[in-house]
Amino acid sequence: MKLNEVKEFVKELRGLSQEELAKRENELKKELFELRFQAATGQLEQTARLKEVKKQIARIKTVQSEAK
């Protein structure tokens, strides 16, 4: 993600409720699990997607902690 995309993503996250953030986090965790499984079996083509999903999860957790 480019810097502008990251800023847009975080801005969007800050507009969501805690429940919506938790839902989005769970979706990304499922995607991360699937990506790790693909990587382990040698089927993953976009290896950078792993890093991107991890960072998105971290951003969601950061926004959640800011709201507390």
Curated annotation (Swiss-Prot):
Asked if Ribonucleoprotein is a keyword of the record, the answer is: yes
Superkingdom of origin organism: Bacteria
Q: Name one GO cellular component term.
A: cytosolic large ribosomal subunit
Drop me one GO molecular function for this one. Answer: structural constituent of ribosome
Keywords, in A-Z order = Ribonucleoprotein, Ribosomal protein
In Pfam terms, one family for this protein is Ribosomal_L29
- State the Gene Ontology BP annotations: translation
Q: Does the keyword Glycoprotein apply?
A: no
InterPro entries xrefs: Ribosomal_protein_uL29 (IPR050063), Ribosomal_uL29 (IPR001854), Ribosomal_uL29_CS (IPR018254), Ribosomal_uL29_sf (IPR036049)
User: Which residues pair up as cystines?
Assistant: none
NCBIfam families under this entry? L29
Indicate the family of this protein: Belongs to the universal ribosomal protein uL29 family.
Q: What protein does this entry describe?
A: Large ribosomal subunit protein uL29
Give the species.
Streptococcus pneumoniae serotype 4 (strain ATCC BAA-334 / TIGR4)
Q: Which gene encodes it?
A: rpmC
